[in-house]
Amino acid sequence: MLVVEDVADLRDFYAILLREEGYDVACACDGSDALRWLSWRPDVILLDLMMPVMNGYEFYAKMREIPGDHPPVIVVSAVAPMRAELPGIHATLPKPFEFSQLLSRVATAVTHGPTPSAAAF
């Protein structure tokens, strides 16, 4: 699982809790950093939208340009995106949220599996 969050305390908090649930977690501080982690082939990406350097929208668009299947993406953000802005997004989770809500969406995303690249649509 890849956690993409610019706020270090939140990023660390998500990672600790998800690791306690048995997930293998890597972290990125922005979209540019997250692109480098894609070769790791995470099962799920938790994506904040408002980040410096490369925001979540830009990261998502660039990821979908890469040929092949992509991990399900769960948008975790205080900004509520419209699904039309992020075609193929697996789920959204508005901040603040209960950790049980995150775990439920992650479990569903892991079961769902990868989605095809934008070129396949």
Predicted regions and their residues:
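Hydrophobic/aromatic residues positioned on beta-strands within the core alpha/beta folds
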Residues: 76-77
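Conserved acidic carboxylate
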Residues: 5
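Charged docking surfaces used in two-component/phosphorelay signaling
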Residues: 12-20
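Active-site residues of response regulator receiver
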Residues: 48
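Acidic catalytic/metal-coordinating carboxylates
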Residues: 30, 55-61
